[in-house]
Amino acid sequence: MPSIVRNHGPHNKILLSALLLALFGWVPLASAAVAVPMDSTGPYRTVSHPENAPSGVDAGVGPSEWTHAYANPAHNAAFPVPDDAPEWIRNGVSWLFPEARAWPLANPPFGSKTYGAAEASVTQTQFYGNALGPSVVDGVVYAESDDMFAYAVNAKTGKLIWRASPVGNNLMGNPLVIGNTVYLSAGSVAFNFANVLRYAHNPSASARGLNVSFNGIYALNRSNGKLLWYFATPGETMATPAYDNNTLFIADGAGNAFGINATTGKQVWKTHVGGMDNMSSVTAYRHNIYFAMAIKPYLYCLNESNGHIVWKGTIPGASNTGIGDVSPAAADGVVVLDATTKPQANKKAMFSNVIRAFDAKTGAVLWTRNMGSGGKIPAFKGGVPMIHNNIVYVGNPVASTYQAYELKTGKLLWTWHVPTKVAAGAGRSAPTYYKGLLYITTGQYIFVVNPATGKELHQHHIGGQFGIESPVIVGGTVYLTNSWDWIMAIPLKTISHGS
């Protein structure tokens, strides 16, 4: 990529880069390389093994692009393959890939003796391993990790193609893969003391991740992981962007939403709505985008082209962080969101999870349901919904249940109680529907549930811990990541037959 400035020495390039970053949130690679050199022999260098990339028919396995967190607006990451697909993907493959900070799957959370198992597990989930599941495109598994690396791994062999760490920050999203580019989102759950004081003074003007690290979107070369451009955001961008019409859409921890040119990394529009986006990934649907903000607890619908607010809605009584955690799902003209609500007055710390459906075009409330109550849960306050065939499948972490609702009417179809051997707070991840079965990752297990009745059919123990990582199913293989910093492939028949 050519520099946008003439060569007047490195000092002037550094100053111009700083000015561009401050004014526009964008730095061209030529200038960025001068200001931030990368040690070619250091531990955070980009490592590339092109010989491990898939070739031939193997390079066409799976979807050809990945545009959203959980694959698509409906959050169902399931991809059948044709009968003439390679045998390995039809029958399933099995491998384990340890990421940079891989922790033994049989071990309790790091630091359990000091912090206690519950607190250590939350800390490991937020700072150590994978926050979301992988993306699978054209025979390659892509993953972001809190270990500060992004990975590209051969979907058949489990061998590393490249590993890159473009910034010293947590990478908590689903990599988007479009054309020859991989897009990462960088941001941490952390607050520095200035952020805490800002919240104490004026909660509605608070910002998460401000001045904590270099937040924003990083575009990498899909073939080798090299940095192409960086778009800076003031607040954290833990959530995953959405892609549509050559534009990336992201919301940050400082109350902003952005439209970004996916080719150049330049800002198309910016809208400040206030509040904080935690892990609420953007959904692009029918020329609008949808995301939720905490503190000022609203679900927003913005016009894709200009960022103008079309409508906003809320969930009554949503907790401070709850409504900004969950990614909205959209299908058949309906947008669905849920959140943990504040405890009722004079009640003993009992929380509820509430789900609400909105008309995607107008924001009119279609229905609202209380999913059930339970004790206070740590961290992520809600369950990520998934929509398939006019049914919403969604978890409730305060009650450790999953439920199915009719999309248009909100009629409750069934409730499945996660087994008690799974840690409290189960029910955060989006289920995956594939060939008449529902696959759910929670605790140390992946479960198979009948989507018509809610009856548990099988369970498969994996170890480690699943938070909001959902299964990605391609043909006969389930691809997973987890908080213990592993990428893995498991044959579908191993899980669906029980073990």
Swiss-Prot record:
Pfam families registered for this protein in UniProt: PQQ_2
Family, similarity comment: Belongs to the tetrathionate hydrolase family.
Known partners and oligomeric status: Homodimer.
Listed GO MF terms: hydrolase activity
Entry function: Catalyzes the hydrolysis of tetrathionate to generate elemental sulfur, thiosulfate and sulfate.
Mutation effect (C301A): No change in activity. Does not affect dimerization
Subcellular location: Cell membrane
Main location, first listed in the record: membrane
Record GO cellular component, one term: plasma membrane
Coiled coil: none
Source species taxonomy: Bacteria, Pseudomonadati, Pseudomonadota, Acidithiobacillia, Acidithiobacillales
Enzyme nomenclature, EC number: 3.12.1.-
Protein name: Tetrathionate hydrolase
Catalytic activity: tetrathionate + H2O = sulfur + thiosulfate + sulfate + H(+)
Taxonomic source organism: Acidithiobacillus ferrooxidans (strain ATCC 23270 / DSM 14882 / CIP 104768 / NCIMB 8455) (Ferrobacillus ferrooxidans (strain ATCC 23270))
Keywords noted in UniProt: Cell membrane, Hydrolase, Membrane, Signal
Temperature dependence: Optimum temperature is 60 degrees Celsius.
pH dependence of this protein's activity: Optimum pH is 3.0.
Range of residues in the leader sequence: 1-32
